[in-house]
A protein has these predicted regions:
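Flexible beta->alpha loop and helix N-cap segments adjacent to enzyme active/binding sites
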Residues: 1-27, 77-78, 82-299
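Gly-rich Lys/Arg/Thr-decorated short loops/hinges at beta-loop-alpha junctions or inter-strand turns
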Residues: 29-46, 233-239
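Secondary-structure capping and boundary motifs in well-ordered enzyme cores
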Residues: 40-43, 47, 51, 73, ...
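Phosphate/ATP-binding catalytic cores across multiple sugar-kinase/actin-like superfamilies
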Residues: 45-69
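Short glycine-rich phosphate-binding loop at a beta-alpha junction
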Residues: 65-74, 152
């Protein structure tokens, strides 16, 4: 969103794809290609163009075989590319919630098991039993967000994957820029990085471009609601999480209580951790997070 297309940069970046870049680009190559003359944002923008072009070609081949595509790998966390692939597949695209190397462990286990596994949800981690009935706890959480702007939630089994989907989340009011600044400060993130909105599946069209169901935060869509600055990126998009009526966690109850008290069916949702640290897993982690960062964590 911050970079620009550079016609002379594309072939230079394309030539790098024949090298192993896991450890970065060697300085000798940077110097030889004059890459240090370009802004990092421009390099990222043009690398994204190459990635999307390559993926489009691969998907064209896959769609010759089937109308349905299952897509994995760490690159499947690239939400901008995913949205374009979703359109290319006319919506018939499924991405595992943990598509990177770590998610392969579950696939290996399923293969060893040797039987069909019915995928229900990604809540497979350590379980924190709620301290009180779900509706009562959801009410406390929403009252706290209304008063202080944000809070943490650590209830139920942890998510299996890199996205916090409501069980290990830091939630905030998305209707003002103040909340975005507060959360960025706590999480020690760069100011330009956007946060994700969680929204009722049935209310997506009220706030975002219609046609996208994304329960695992895997795609970006145009935000059409000007009253949600905290979850809208510079390019006008949002990485949405859609929450269905069948959501098996406390998160649906929290959103319902939030809408009842504010009229808004969207919450800012980000992972309950600090940059460089793992997500909160158990009650001890939750207590430590609350004490260290001064953010109330409900469980």
């Amino acid at each position: 969103a911050f970079g620009k297309y550079k016609k002379d940069l594309l072939p230079k970046l394309f030539s790098l794809f024949s090298h192993n870049l896991h450890k970065g680009i060697p300085k000798s190559m940077v110097d030889a290609m004059g890459l240090d003359r370009y802004k990092p944002a421009d390099i990222a923008f043009n690398a994204q163009i190459i990635l999307e072009n390559k993926l489009e070609g691969l998907f064209n081949k896959a769609l010759e075989i089937s109308d349905n595509v299952v897509y994995g790998g760490g690159v499947a966390l690239n939400c901008v590319a995913n949205s374009k692939l979703h359109e290319q597949c006319k919506g018939n695209l499924w991405i595992f919630p943990n598509p990177g190397d770590a998610g392969g462990s579950l696939g290996a286990a399923a293969l060893a098991y040797g039987k069909k596994v019915n995928w229900e949800h990604p809540y497979l981690g350590f379980n924190i039993e709620p301290s009180k009935p779900i509706k009562a706890l959801a009410k406390e959480i929403v009252i706290h967000i209304k008063k202080y702007g944000m809070c943490g939630v650590a209830v139920g089994p942890a998510e299996f994957g890199p996205r916090a989907l409501g069980n290990r989340s830091l939630l905030a009011d998305p209707r003002g820029a103040k909340a975005q600044d507060q959360v960025n400060t706590i999480k020690r993130r760069q100011k330009f990085r956007p946060f994700a909105p969680a929204v009722f599946e049935e209310d997506v069209n009220l706030h975002f471009k219609p046609g996208y169901i994304s329960p695992y935060m895997q795609m970006v869509v145009d935000c059409t609601d000007p009253n949600l600055p905290a979850i809208t990126h510079k390019d006008g998009t949002s990485r949405i999480q859609t929450v269905s009526k069948n959501e098996p966690t406390i998160f649906r109850a929290i959103l319902e209580e939030w809408k009842k008290r504010t009229g808004c069916s969207v919450l800012l949702n980000t992972s309950l951790n600090i940059r460089g640290e793992p997500m909160v897993n158990n009650i001890s982690d939750a207590d430590r997070f609350e004490e260290k960062y001064g953010v109330k964590v409900f469980y």
